[in-house]
Amino acid sequence: MGRSPCCDKNGVKKGPWTAEEDQKLIDYIRFHGPGNWRTLPKNAGLHRCGKSCRLRWTNYLRPDIKRGRFSFEEEETIIQLHSVMGNKWSAIAARLPGRTDNEIKNHWNTHIRKRLVRSGIDPVTHSPRLDLLDLSSLLSALFNQPNFSAVATHASSLLNPDVLRLASLLLPLQNPNPVYPSNLDQNLQTPNTSSESSQPQAETSTVPTNYETSSLEPMNARLDDVGLADVLPPLSESFDLDSLMSTPMSSPRQNSIEAETNSSTFFDFGIPEDFILDDFMF
């Protein structure tokens, strides 16, 4: 069996450290060095376990601890070391002077991991992944670039058109007012226009113009043979223009009077004198 943890011993204090305990630990390590962490609490006059003293010194009391934000070079080093070592924060902190393992772990979970996810990289395997929401954010950043027109021209040949089309549909949901060239949808179409253009188009049948003229020629010939005298009846020799002008034209008013007169005489009938009405009475 292994050794029992030092924290399980009776009389060991737990909980937050006080300023007096911090000063005792700093003074002892400054004069004697850390030495053996299991015997340090007793020698320093602390009612703490060795592990608690080590973590307190390593993460908070060391004079060479670097405070503040992580630089870009430090983040890139953490990403490279994490791709090889995984979640071994103590080993990663040993290669970053001034940074503690606890601080590196917190910065990884709160900043670096989210940045990798937004960039389309799996934070566990460090391999690219095609997550739809992450891909739409990538395309959103790509649309804002000034040289996007040249990239969009060759987008269909570089990436899968189906994925790009789906991402272009998801982009307006995330950004209500997207700014990107209008010819993006044309560039993201599947390359099937060449096959469609290669299909022969149906030729529309047109009637030749000489057919119409040839069909009208016999009719024109027949009209030429028929004279005006054959169509109009001959005028009488006594016909004179003066007689035509002297004949009064019937007005619509006269025509209506004549129609009323004819209708009144149409219903006139006479009763014979020898008609006896009693013969028809019952």
UniProtKB/Swiss-Prot annotation:
Q: Where in the cell is it found?
A: Nucleus
Q: What does UniProt give as the signal peptide span?
A: none
Q: Which residues carry this modification: Phosphoserine?
A: 251
Compositional bias segments (type: Polar residues)? 183-213
Residue numbers spanned by region Disordered = 180-213
Pfam families assigned: Myb_DNA-binding
Q: Which InterPro entries match?
A: Homeodomain-like_sf (IPR009057), Myb_dom (IPR017930), Myb_TF_plants (IPR015495), SANT/Myb (IPR001005)
The feature table lists the DNA-binding region at 37-61, 89-112
Q: What induces it?
A: Induced by salt stress. Induced by osmotic stress. Induced by abscisic acid.
GO MF? DNA-binding transcription factor activity; transcription cis-regulatory region binding
Matching entries from PROSITE patterns are given as:
HTH_MYB (PS51294)
SUPFAM superfamilies the record matches: Homeodomain-like
Assigned keywords, A-Z: DNA-binding, Nucleus, Phosphoprotein, Repeat, Stress response, Transcription, Transcription regulation
Q: Where is the HTH myb-type domain?
A: 9-65, 66-116
PTM description: Phosphorylated at Ser-251 by MPK6 in response to salt stress. Phosphorylation is required for its function in salt stress tolerance.
Entry GO terms, CC: nucleus
In its UniProt record, which GO terms are filed under biological process? Answer: cuticle hydrocarbon biosynthetic process; multidimensional cell growth; negative regulation of DNA-templated transcription; regulation of primary metabolic process; regulation of raffinose metabolic process
SMART domains recorded: SANT
Q: Does the keyword Transcription regulation apply?
A: yes
**Function text:** Transcription factor involved in salt stress response. Confers tolerance to salt stress. Involved in distinct cellular processes in response to osmotic stress, including control of primary metabolism and negative regulation of short-term transcriptional responses to osmotic stress. Can activate the steps necessary for aliphatic suberin synthesis and deposition of cell wall-associated suberin-like lamellae. Involved in the production of aliphatic suberin under abiotic stress conditions.
Q: What is the annotated quaternary arrangement, including any partners?
A: Interacts with MPK6.
Q: Which protein is depicted?
A: Transcription factor MYB41
What organism does this protein naturally occur in? Arabidopsis thaliana
